[in-house]
């Protein structure tokens, strides 16, 4: 039997995802449990975190387990990921040893590793996460790399709670690009597109120009999900028509992939579209729609104060749900091992 990881939701069946969401809702009602009693998880952070680190540490504790946080290059040795490399530079040990040793100590490994923002053809291979999964003898959880599957489930649970049903089919869902002074990772956008189409919603990807359309892998996943789950998928560059009648508006900033690693000429293009900010006028076009964002969010850059403080904003609910869905993920995966 092969080891089951949580690297992206597309690897899990709809029934398995529904089971995770059901368990997360149960954990939300009953905080403490014993599913991880005597178990441990190594949380490996190559990039900063607030919600992810806090929710995973507390989640393990609340289920009777223990979390160990490691930051390679800071409080742990820098890691090499390429085979055949003559390691006479800054890296001190190879992932082949790191993952296998950690797997002898702990029962789960979580990994957060953002793209390097230099070469998308390399970053899209998700080398760090896949290397941990390759060598680890215990399940690996994606804590955000080029996708953010934990955020996907937290978002889905928040929507199910708001609409009072696990069935989100037929809801009009807008994934809108928003301005940010820096080019950001596409991970959350990739994940939002994936889970929204998986849930059978009518999804519109709203972005300024074709350059901001997401990587073809995730567009293909979305099309596959539409075929299997119903719903629809379209790309729009027209703000008002995209917002019109929307039940859900989900905002995220990301850099244009054609400029990946060459961001200087992309910045003046991005700067032209600061009006993509989510504001009261746009939300008034919706069907009393809810707004959410993965956080952190720069107020009055990505969304206005009024939108963030509106009763229709469910971003805090979504953030809370990170705790509950991650407990469900850990509980579902723990106990597996391979020689």
Curated annotation (Swiss-Prot):
Outcome after substituting residue 92 to A/P/S/V: Generates an enzyme capable of carbamoylation of N-succinyl-L-ornithine while losing its ability to use N-acetyl-L-ornithine as substrate, thus converting it from a N-acetylornithine transcarbamylase (AOTCase) to a N-succinylornithine transcarbamylase (SOTCase)
EC number in record: 2.1.3.9
SUPFAM superfamilies membership: Aspartate/ornithine carbamoyltransferase
A GO BP entry: arginine biosynthetic process via ornithine
Outcome of substituting residue 302 to A/E/R: Significant decrease in enzymatic activity
Binding-site positions, N(2)-acetyl-L-ornithine: 144, 252, 295
GO cellular component terms given for this protein: cytoplasm
Pathway: Amino-acid biosynthesis; L-arginine biosynthesis
Reaction equation(s) it catalyzes: N(2)-acetyl-L-ornithine + carbamoyl phosphate = N(2)-acetyl-L-citrulline + phosphate + H(+)
Pfam name, any one: OTCace
Notes on how activity is controlled: Carboxylation at Lys-302 increases the catalytic activity of the enzyme. Is potently inhibited by N(alpha)-acetyl-N(delta)-phosphonoacetyl-L-ornithine (PALAO).
Keywords associated with the record: Amino-acid biosynthesis, Arginine biosynthesis, Cytoplasm, Transferase
Molecular functions per Gene Ontology: amino acid binding; N-acetylornithine carbamoyltransferase activity; ornithine carbamoyltransferase activity
Disulfide bridge map: none
InterPro entries, alphabetized: ArgF, Asp/Orn_carbamoyltranf_P-bd, Asp/Orn_carbamoylTrfase, Asp/Orn_carbamoylTrfase_sf, Asp_carbamoyltransf_Asp/Orn-bd
Modified residues (N6-carboxylysine): 302
Record-marked site positions (Key residue in conferring substrate specificity for N-acetyl-L-ornithine versus N-succinyl-L-ornithine): 92
Residues bound to carbamoyl phosphate: 49-52, 77, 112, 148-151, 294-295, 322
Compartments in which it is found: Cytoplasm
Function in brief: Catalyzes the transfer of the carbamoyl group from carbamoyl phosphate to the delta-amino group of N(2)-acetyl-L-ornithine to produce N(2)-acetyl-L-citrulline. This is a step in an alternative arginine biosynthesis pathway. The enzyme has no activity with ornithine.
Quaternary organization: Homotrimer.
HAMAP family assigned to the protein according to its UniProt record, in alphabetical order: AOTCase
Alphabetical list of PANTHER family matching this protein: ORNITHINE CARBAMOYLTRANSFERASE, MITOCHONDRIAL (PTHR45753), ORNITHINE TRANSCARBAMYLASE, MITOCHONDRIAL (PTHR45753:SF3)
NCBIfam families given in the database record: PRK04523.1
Designated name of the protein: N-acetylornithine carbamoyltransferase
Gene name, Swiss-Prot/TrEMBL: argF'
């Amino acid at each position: 039997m092969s080891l089951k990881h949580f690297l992206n939701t597309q690897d899990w069946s709809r029934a398995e995802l529904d089971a995770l969401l059901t368990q997360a809702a149960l954990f939300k009602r009953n905080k403490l449990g014993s599913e991880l009693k005597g178990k441990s998880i190594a949380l490996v952070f190559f990039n900063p975190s607030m919600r992810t680190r806090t929710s995973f540490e507390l989640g393990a504790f609340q289920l009777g387990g223990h979390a160990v946080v490691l930051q390679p290059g800071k409080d742990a040795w820098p890691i090499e990921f390429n085979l055949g490399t003559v390691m006479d530079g800054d890296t001190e040990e190879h992932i082949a040893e790191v993952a296998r040793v950690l797997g002898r100590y702990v029962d789960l490994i979580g990994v957060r590793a953002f793209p390097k923002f230099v070469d998308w053809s390399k970053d899209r291979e998700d080398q760090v996460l896949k290397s941990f999964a390759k060598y680890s003898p215990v399940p690996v959880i994606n804590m955000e790399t080029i996708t953010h599957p934990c955020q996907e489930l937290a978002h889905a649970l928040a929507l199910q709670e708001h609409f009072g049903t696990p069935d989100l089919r037929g809801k009009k869902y807008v994934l809108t690009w928003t301005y940010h002074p820096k080019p950001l990772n596409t991970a959350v956008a990739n994940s939002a597109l994936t889970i929204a189409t998986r849930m059978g919603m009518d999804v519109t990807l709203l972005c300024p120009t074709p350059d901001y359309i997401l990587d073809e892998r995730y567009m293909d996943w979305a099309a596959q999900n539409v075929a299997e789950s119903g719903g629809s998928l379209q790309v729009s560059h027209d703000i008002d028509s995209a917002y019109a009648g929307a039940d859900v508006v989900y905002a995220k900033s990301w850099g244009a992939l054609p400029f990946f690693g060459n961001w200087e000429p992309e910045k003046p293009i991005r700067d032209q579209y600061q009006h993509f900010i989510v504001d009261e006028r746009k939300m008034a076009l919706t069907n009393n729609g809810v707004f959410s964002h993965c956080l952190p969010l720069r107020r009055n850059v990505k969304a206005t104060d009024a939108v963030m403080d509106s009763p229709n904003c469910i971003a805090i609910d979504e953030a809370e749900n990170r705790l509950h869905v991650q407990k469900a993920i850990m509980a579902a995966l723990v106990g597996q091992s391979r020689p």
